[in-house]
Amino acid sequence: MADDPRSGRPVMIDHQRIVSVTLVAPPKKYGVTHWSSRLLGRHLGISNTTVARAWRDYGVQPWRLETSKVPTDPELVGKVTDVVGLYLAPPENAVVLCVDEKSQIQALDRTAPMLPMQPGLPARRTHDYERHGTSTLFAALDIATGTVTGACKPRHRHQEFLAFLKQVARAYPDRELHLVMDNYATHKRVEVRDWLTANPRIRVHFTPTSGSWLNLVEVWFGIIERQAIHRGSFPSVKDLNAKIRAFITGWNDRCHPFVWTKTADQILKKANRKTTSTTRH
């Protein structure tokens, strides 16, 4: 004798219902900001594995959180259109440079040598370090080639910024330059504006307020941070500066341009999205 085939235990609650509850903030009695699979399972009277399976099927991840900032620049549309236009259709016979500074780079020296990576083991370093001062890296990224003009300076006042602009101008003599910059105060000092007025071949294009992400040199700053600074050990600011310059030299030997893909309309549509949250937050 044998049992007839059976369908198994009937489904108590479907995945769509689980997800719909997940998208609503937990009741105040729980004192939490978002659901965990165990808490939601207990709340619905089902297993946490069932909750986790529903989340996986629908791509729901309550534990994740991203930050955003509502654009407030009254010139948002014009600035985004201007900068993105330079990236997607740069002017002929001109150079477009993304300019900014990476300030307060710390010269940190580990108290013991780093242990190298081995099969099955990542590189290791001590948590303890000694501080030996800071440096500021000024950089100008050529969007057509990816090459970088850089300079390390002890401070990041308008004096240092203006000196760097003059260095950039010397690096591109007799060329029309379009500089993409953010709204940092030193970039708008009267001394800087006067110098730009006296050099009409150099034009500035400002990113929107809180829109530094539009500046492609920020991508390059992330690269140098990951590849040369974060895991480095620097016994002095002089050593830090030397290694930054070495990275720039190596980068320029193997560089490539960054390709901008989104249009201004796509960016503005996303920036102007209305809030659709239905939670009580």
Per-segment meaning from a language model:
Residues 124-129, 198-216, 232-234:
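RNase H-like polynucleotidyl transferase catalytic core
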Residues 2-50, 90-91:
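A short, amphipathic alpha-helix used for macromolecular contacts
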Residues 80-166, 269-277:
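Extended, low-complexity cationic-aromatic segments
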Residues 109, 239-281:
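C-terminal domain-tail junction helix/linker
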Residues 148, 217-239, 250-252:
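Active-site proximal helix-loop segment of RNase H-like, two-metal nucleases, encompassing DDE(D)
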Residues 175-187:
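Acidic/histidine-rich, metal-coordinating catalytic segments
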Residues 1-12, 55-90, 109-119:
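Basic, flexible linker segments flanking DNA-binding modules
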